[in-house]
Amino acid sequence: MADDLEQQPQGWLSSWLPTWRPTSMSQLKNVEARILQCLQNKFLARYVSLPNQNKIWTVTVSPELRDRTPLVMVHGFGGGVGLWILNMDSLSTRRTLHTFDLLGFGRSSRPTFPRDPEGAEDEFVTSIETWRESMGIPSMILLGHSLGGFLATSYSIKYPDRVKHLILVDPWGFPLRPADPSQVRAPPTWVKAVASVLGRSNPLAVLRVAGPWGPGLVQRFRPDFKRKFADFFDDDTISEYIYHCNAQNPSGETAFKAMMESFGWARRPMLERIHLIRKDVPITMIYGANTWIDTSTGKKVKLQRPDSYVRDLEIEGASHHVYADQPHIFNAVVEEICDSVD
């Protein structure tokens, strides 16, 4: 309906009044283009069609470097390909890098997901596998941040032959929810705000309900994003990108809500299943030293996989968005991992 009104204004009043929810896929496309134009390496951006007619928005950097195993990066909740802008050039100097908007997020298709946690998770994982098949990628170094780390782990359980190394960056949804709240790290203000509305609506519904004030809410609750990307942008480009990614139809957001018990916890915690990943799949877990995520998970994964390669490390001066808080250190660590593969 909103898109129709934008394309075909009905009279002078419609053209005079601002659109209640000032967003569209074309606006998301435009702000993403401003971000991607910062790339120095050759890149290709396009839709990859899946057999079920869904489409996955995909960015491939350095497509000509085919001799090494490609790195595939999976963003977290509410994110998209643009948030990897501090990493894509550095991590594609010696190998091809692929990143994509998860099904239901960013510019990818936004279908209706199953409402149960297992069904929603499986829908995500199946879309990643059919994307891989459509891309013709035989195997990959798979990196996932936050929700992307949870889904990358689930994918590795089901398709271990396709994963040369699993890199989990501040992964969401691993530990069981403690019975004692005092054992939980204090989350940042924006997480508390999201958690306060979870019982009534989708996590980011407030952005859509706020209408023309939505973009301002992103800037108010996440001013840190502007600082993280200040070397590339001195305006509100990143805040606009985050807003337009999350002011659309909340398809992936609804699926995420089905998978979570509360914002910080999964209904199907990954620690209960990570032992199912084949023993020969190496895992590296990267945390921000100041993250609100439980960093003891790495040690617990080691205990569950005594006969497998598991490395966990913390990056000083970084919080949950490690890749943006300390991009140079993060890029060096990931590049070292990739070089260990080939």
Curated annotation (Swiss-Prot):
GO terms for biological process: lipid catabolic process; lipid homeostasis; N-acylphosphatidylethanolamine metabolic process; phosphatidic acid biosynthetic process. It is an enzyme of class 3 (hydrolase). It catalyses: N-hexadecanoyl-1,2-di-(9Z-octadecenoyl)-sn-glycero-3-phosphoethanolamine + H2O = N-hexadecanoyl-1-(9Z-octadecenoyl)-sn-glycero-3-phosphoethanolamine + (9Z)-octadecenoate + H(+); an N-acyl-1,2-diacyl-sn-glycero-3-phosphoethanolamine + H2O = N,1-diacyl-sn-glycero-3-phosphoethanolamine + a fatty acid + H(+); N-hexadecanoyl-1-(9Z-octadecenoyl)-sn-glycero-3-phosphoethanolamine + H2O = N-hexadecanoyl-sn-glycero-3-phosphoethanolamine + (9Z)-octadecenoate + H(+); N-octadecanoyl-1-(9Z-octadecenoyl)-sn-glycero-3-phosphoethanolamine + H2O = N-octadecanoyl-sn-glycero-3-phospho-ethanolamine + (9Z)-octadecenoate + H(+). Keywords: Hydrolase, Lipid degradation, Lipid metabolism. InterPro entries: AB_hydrolase_1 (IPR000073), AB_hydrolase_fold (IPR029058). It comes from the Eukaryota. One of its GO terms (cellular component) is lipid droplet. This is (Lyso)-N-acylphosphatidylethanolamine lipase. It comes from Bos taurus (Bovine). The lineage of its organism: Eukaryota, Metazoa, Chordata, Craniata, Vertebrata.
